[in-house]
């Protein structure tokens, strides 16, 4: 019998019991943790390579998150009946886990590390994201791989003015906020949220609340780590050659300082390249055996130091702006003639061409996940082609970054979208990033708001987004509004805020250092508010509210109500009736169980014809009414006449004419159109008709 030594740690966390177990499953991995929150269970494995690949100049961390359908007691769809490529939701969760753990690996660590999170059981009320992050933190902490954790994670809701820790799926329905926060015992590292235009102080309070509550997680992982007691790898950061550092500083510092006074991005990049290459050539001429990778790394560090030093010293930013200035804006709506809505939003060297397409309910995205099936009427797709940064590259299916940026923009806009009752259309937004130098996701938010208004979508109000940055050295710090790409990767904090004039709709924050206090975040959020209002003012000059009507090229949806019992009549046998209706009128028809009928067409006459025919099909036969009917069958005792679609009645032989009729065929033939009057509808729905009563009476003879 194989001997196993399980180590288990359980603790109460909000409404749920969390259990972390190791030592039983996946024992050949560097670490494996079976983490549970209620009945939602994930298996997290961590494997790291002991040796670094020669010549590597980056940290190859991979986070794979996979939801197995068996976790929810389901069998996958499709021909192969097995899980395929990651869904959008799985990709987003993988990014959510990657972002806070990446900065906790030590500088200079470049060994390959792979984290695999597998959802093996799921309670439909408890989403796997939080326990996946907790399990990942625990697995990394006990793996022996150099890791400056542990990390805690929490989800925060906000209902009736109260914060809720790790709300259930049902509780989130009524929540004005869904915020995920991760951090160490002393610092917040990552925030991801969607909100119903909440004030800055409520959002900041949620971040602080979530960070405070997750300390119990961090303590439990520390106790698990002590019990497992696995030796940490014998790894040390590469020793820096101080002589080489000094030489590089002498060769390149002045040139880099001058290069970063060039405001145009492409020209600046070119000059930075010239300075770096000159320094490298000088060093290689002096020592041909010098490590070029080390030189490149030190040049990058010097570049970062130069840029940060200028900002902290109070000098103008890279492009000449003051810290709180937003780049020049150029905003246009209705730029494409045949799309249903469009906009071109330009902020400095960042530009988004955004289109809006309206469709019917049939065009909505149907999603079948382990948490259940649902329909998404509002879709936002973000594309980042290589030409947007002046490069060549692969073009194809969206990458993780594009999926993540698209979802962030979606969160920013979703709070102002109309309900299905207010606007019965499916909406697809596509944001094409045509230029990029910082914060293209927030440009997508602004462009989406404009395109929706141009399409006539009745959104509640305009939404704008802004990306903020931070440079902190000791106690000195500078908050930057509308950061450039260079300021993003050279700074200490990157956070993106989308919202209306009334509050925040989406907040994403990634913090790379410790020591970011609540006060610093508060200053940053207030500065972001000022920038957001400035952008909204410019946007409102281009288009201040949604257009009064949708585009002439968009399908117009007309809604009518019918008796729910008549739905089967509209559908017909095997769908024959509705198929004929849509083909012959050129419309799209959708039926709901409550009798709601939606007819969509860009042709008004086609819509009217479809409505007329549906009303005919669903009309009730009225006693005493005269109808134009058509003979469909002749029998010995009379004739059957269709008076409405699917409604036949019998004209008895005695009701065909005033005189006595011996043979029905002498008076009627199949296909003949006749006027008939409804005499009776019996309890079984059988209709008795009369031609005799429908015929105009002969004038009475004139009196003698």
UniProtKB/Swiss-Prot annotation:
Keywords from the named record: Cytoplasm, Magnesium, Metal-binding, Nucleotidyltransferase, RNA-binding, Transferase
Database matches in InterPro entries: ExoRNase_PH_dom1, ExoRNase_PH_dom2, ExoRNase_PH_dom2_sf, KH_dom, KH_dom_type_1, KH_dom_type_1_sf, NA-bd_OB-fold, PNPase
Gene Ontology CC: one annotated term: cytosol
SMART domains the UniProt entry points to: KH (SM00322), S1 (SM00316)
Annotated EC: 2.7.7.8
Reactions the enzyme catalyzes: RNA(n+1) + phosphate = RNA(n) + a ribonucleoside 5'-diphosphate
GO molecular function: 3'-5'-RNA exonuclease activity; magnesium ion binding; polyribonucleotide nucleotidyltransferase activity; RNA binding
Occurrences of domain S1 motif (ranges): 624-692
Cofactor(s) of this protein: Mg(2+)
Coiled coil: none
Function (record text): Involved in mRNA degradation. Catalyzes the phosphorolysis of single-stranded polyribonucleotides processively in the 3'- to 5'-direction.
Family statement: Belongs to the polyribonucleotide nucleotidyltransferase family.
Subunit structure: Component of the RNA degradosome, which is a multiprotein complex involved in RNA processing and mRNA degradation.
Protein name: Polyribonucleotide nucleotidyltransferase
